[in-house]
Amino acid sequence: MDANLWLWVGQILLALAFLSVAYGHALGFEAWSVRPGFGWMTAVGRNNMRVIGGLELLGSVGLILPAVTGVLLWLTPVAATCLAVLMALSVIFHARRHGEGASIVLNLILGLIAILVAYGRFVVAPL
C-alpha cells in the first residue's frame, strides 16, 4: 500500500478518536468527571476542559475536512501537529499524577500517530 493510503488511515483513526472524546471533554464535564479513570478532569477544571474539547474537535475536523474539500490543504498537517502537541502536554500532565499509566500510554500512541500524519502530510505525501 502507498503512503497516502496509510496516512488516510492515520487521519481517520485520529479524527474518530478525538471526536469520540471531544464532546465529553467540552460539554459533558459533570457526567464524565465522575467516571472511573476520569477524576483528573476535576483537577483540570470545567473551563479548561471546554478548551481542550474544543481543540480536539477542531483538530478532528482539520484532519479530514481540508482534504475532502480541497480547500486550505495545509491545515491537515498543522492540525496533526497541534494534536501531537496536545498529546505531549497530556502525557506530562498524567505523568505528574499517580496511577494514570493507561492515560499516558493512550496519549503516547495518539501522539505518535499524529506525528506520523504530520510528517507524512508535510513531507512524504502532501495533499
Regions found by a protein language model. Give the residues of each.
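Membrane-interface extramembranous regions
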Residues: 1-127
